[in-house]
């Protein structure tokens, strides 16, 4: 049976999915006679962009990024702001950190204790009563202690009066600044968590408290700081290593270029280089984790868990735990096994992958400008991300300071009500709830704009998702048009028009903005549902309802499958749009029917190639990552002058690895779109033509031959 003959069951399936393409002597690839498609969706998309710009301008007028950059004390004043009394007081200090374990921390998004700005954190244990005893002998002790008190504090007040006025903390303990806040200076001694070599301390109220309680309190505060930066040390590391990071990223770009060039000539050999390289890099990671795990067995303190040490100002402490390296080793072992199993089960399709890689290399060789297109995508995505972040920051910092009643003891019927700190002590609330505080809570307001800020946040996120998916869709459609032009050129490169990528990009923008917006809107809606689902999961993660957890897991799985299926269909729809210029729904239907009419050939499609390209990305990122690890940890004696001593070597290391992967993804995504476009055009070619002299195939003979062999084997089975 030759390739043009079809069994009866296949013919009936094709009737269900439309008629095959017929021969058209005038068809020479992407049509030039087009009209605008999905105009209504285009208009809605443009209106949303205009609204997005207006929202950004309004947020810029009302917002104040200083509220995100500086910590705010209980009076709503910024710590460290220039031109204010707190200019030299850059750190936020909590009077009673132990109160941050209260459930009201999550309810009010604020720790129920007085907070002031200080210039430095305490360096020793000292209670207020002990300070008073020392003050009678040496007045300088008050000068040290008053740094952590209000300006109205006096050293002669009794402890009872001090608690009533809330002028000073009852006790201080060794702390270090982290995220511009004073956190306990934790350390380990003989496997035990300590602060200043102590495991217990006096709280200033006559009680003895453990270090574990302080750790829990610090963790409670940390839940409120998840949107803050990692601190000054991270920026110091970036300032020291930025040029080395750029060098690493340039090496990744050159390496990606080299791989793409080599794929055209030695695709088979390079395939096995990918396989062996990825397995080797993961194997090295397993060996390194095992070595670190073995070495740490000699240190008693390494038996602590991440939960035991809690939040740390020195993140390197986590890498001093056996648990960290053991977990990383297990993860890498699982990845290694998955890669090896996939190679075993996909071994029969390696030939298809190699041929498709060669065909993709030829196409890119004839249209080299496609390798530059990822730079445009990167620029557009960067603009979208920056605008979204800036708008979100200005929205989050819009409004005026809002103060709320906080009862440290938790026994006040007026708790969580708004208040005015200027007159709070004279109000009925202060009389009804002795010890209650009127502390800064957040920035808000009662105007119409402030009431709709949560809605604006949702709109900001949704349009952001729509825009980034549109940018990706635009790139896929433009690349598909360029590669389709290559495929349908009978004599290459003579029949390939000049500037195919520029022409395809212009067609996509001029005629098909609405169709691309339609497809990206569907993906954005699915992603919004996923985000809402994750939000609900976060709110309900402490529930013990097994049914609820099961339903959440099922919904996650369903949305993940739906998103990937829609993305696959959208890519093929964009290819059809690039070739025929029809609207999104018609193009998606045509692409789906084409794939279903050729379901046997789809069984040997380019999915294996995607896997190979993914391994190529891992190989590039892993190779640069290993080199960066050896360099930033000063284990490369070949380079005499490396980076200076770093606070956290993993900061530039992770940046280089992530950046290298994104660069490799940008280059290899062009390859992936090329392969998918060639495959769709190949299916159309088989339906339009029969290989005769009058109707010759446009596909190359090696690719045609291997697909005919695969189809024959499938039919025989």
From Swiss-Prot:
Membrane topology field: Multi-pass membrane protein
Domain of life from the UniProt record: Eukaryota
One GO BP annotation of this record: phosphatidylcholine biosynthetic process
A GO MF label: choline transmembrane transporter activity
Segments of this protein annotated with the region Disordered: 1-24
InterPro entries: Choline_transptr-like
Glycosylation sites: 88, 190, 314
Reactions catalysed according to its record: choline(out) + n H(+)(in) = choline(in) + n H(+)(out)
Keywords on record: Antiport, Cell membrane, Glycoprotein, Membrane, Transmembrane, Transmembrane helix, Transport
Cytoplasmic side: 1-38, 264-265, 347-351, 396-460, 537-610, 671-717
Transmembrane spans: 39-59, 243-263, 266-286, 326-346, 352-372, 375-395, 461-481, 516-536, 611-631, 650-670
Extracellular compartment residues: 60-242, 287-325, 373-374, 482-515, 632-649
Localisation: Cell membrane
GO CC annotations on file: plasma membrane
PANTHER family: CHOLINE TRANSPORTER-LIKE (SLC FAMILY 44), CHOLINE TRANSPORTER-LIKE PROTEIN 5
Job description of the protein: Choline/H+ antiporter.
Family, per entry: Belongs to the CTL (choline transporter-like) family.
Protein name listed in UniProt: Choline transporter-like protein 5
UniProt organism field: Macaca fascicularis (Crab-eating macaque)
């Amino acid at each position: 049976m030759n390739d043009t003959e079809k069994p009866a069951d296949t013919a009936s399936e094709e009737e269900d999915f439309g008629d095959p393409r017929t021969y058209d002597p005038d068809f020479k690839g992407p049509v030039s006679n087009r009209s605008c498609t999905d105009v209504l969706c285009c208009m809605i998309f443009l209106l949303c962009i205009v609204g997005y710009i207006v929202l950004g301008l309004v947020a810029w007028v009302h917002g104040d990024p200083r509220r995100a950059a500086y910590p705010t004390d209980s009076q709503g004043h910024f710590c460290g702001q220039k031109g204010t009394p707190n200019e030299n007081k850059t750190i936020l200090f909590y009077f009673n950190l132990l109160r941050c374990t209260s459930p009201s921390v999550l309810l009010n998004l604020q720790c129920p204790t007085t907070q002031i700005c200080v210039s430095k954190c305490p360096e020793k244990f000292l209670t207020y009563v002990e300070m008073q005893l020392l003050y009678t002998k040496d007045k300088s002790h008050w000068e040290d202690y008053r740094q952590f008190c209000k300006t109205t504090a006096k050293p002669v007040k009794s402890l009872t009066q001090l608690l009533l006025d809330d002028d000073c903390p009852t006790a201080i303990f060794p702390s270090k600044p982290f995220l511009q806040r004073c956190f306990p200076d934790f350390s380990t001694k003989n496997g035990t968590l300590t602060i200043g070599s102590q495991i217990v301390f006096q709280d200033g109220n006559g009680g003895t408290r453990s270090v574990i309680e302080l750790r829990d309190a610090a963790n409670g505060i940390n839940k409120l700081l998840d949107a803050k930066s990692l601190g000054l040390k991270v920026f110091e590391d970036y300032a020291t290593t930025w040029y080395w990071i750029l060098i690493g990223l340039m090496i990744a770009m050159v390496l990606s270029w080299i791989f793409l060039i080599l794929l055209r000539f030695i695709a088979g050999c390079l395939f096995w280089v990918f396989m062996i390289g990825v397995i080797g890099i993961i194997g090295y990671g397993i060996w390194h984790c095992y070595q670190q795990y073995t070495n740490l067995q000699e240190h008693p303190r390494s038996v602590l868990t991440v939960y035991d040490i809690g939040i740390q100002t020195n993140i390197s402490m986590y890498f001093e735990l056996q648990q960290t390296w053991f977990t990383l080793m297990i993860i890498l072992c699982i990845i290694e096994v998955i890669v090896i199993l996939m190679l075993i089960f996909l071994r029969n399709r390696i030939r298809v992958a190699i041929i498709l890689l060669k065909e993709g290399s030829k196409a890119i060789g004839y249209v080299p400008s496609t390798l530059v297109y990822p730079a445009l995508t990167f620029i557009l995505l960067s603009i979208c991300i920056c605008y979204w972040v800036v708008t979100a920051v200005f929205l989050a910092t819009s409004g005026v300071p809002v103060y709320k009643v906080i009862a440290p003891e938790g026994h006040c019927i007026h708790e969580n009500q708004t208040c005015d700190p200027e007159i709070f002590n004279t109000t009925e609330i202060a009389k009804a709830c002795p010890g209650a505080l009127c502390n800064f809570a957040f920035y808000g307001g009662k105007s119409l704009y402030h009431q709709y800020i949560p809605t604006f946040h949702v709109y900001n996120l949704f349009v952001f998702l729509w825009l980034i998916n549109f940018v990706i869709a635009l790139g896929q459609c433009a690349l598909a048009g360029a590669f389709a032009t290559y495929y349908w050129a009978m004599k290459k490169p003579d029949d390939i028009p000049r500037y195919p990528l520029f022409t395809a990009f212009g067609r996509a923008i001029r005629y098909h903005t609405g169709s691309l917006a339609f497809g990206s809107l569907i993906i954005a809606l699915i992603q919004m549902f996923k985000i809402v689902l994750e939000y609900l999961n976060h709110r309900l993660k402490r529930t013990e309802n097994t049914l609820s957890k099961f339903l959440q897991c099922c919904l996650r799985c369903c949305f993940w499958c739906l998103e990937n299926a829609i993305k696959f269909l959208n890519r093929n729809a964009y290819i059809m749009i690039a070739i025929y210029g029809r609207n999104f729904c018609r193009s998606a239907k045509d692409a789906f029917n084409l794939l279903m009419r050729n379901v046997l050939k789809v069984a040997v499609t380019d999915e294996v190639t995607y896997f190979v390209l993914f391994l190529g990305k891992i190989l590039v990122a892993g190779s640069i990552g290993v080199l960066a690890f050896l360099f930033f940890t000063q284990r490369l004696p070949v380079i005499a002058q490396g980076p200076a001593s770093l606070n956290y070597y993993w900061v530039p290391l992770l940046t280089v690895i992530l950046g290298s992967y994104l660069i490799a993804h940008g280059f290899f995504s062009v390859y992936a779109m090329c392969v998918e476009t060639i495959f769709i055009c190949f299916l159309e070619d088989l339906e339009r033509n029969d290989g005769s002299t009058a109707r010759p195939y446009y596909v190359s003979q090696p690719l045609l031959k291997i697909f005919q062999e695969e189809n024959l084997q499938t039919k025989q089975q």
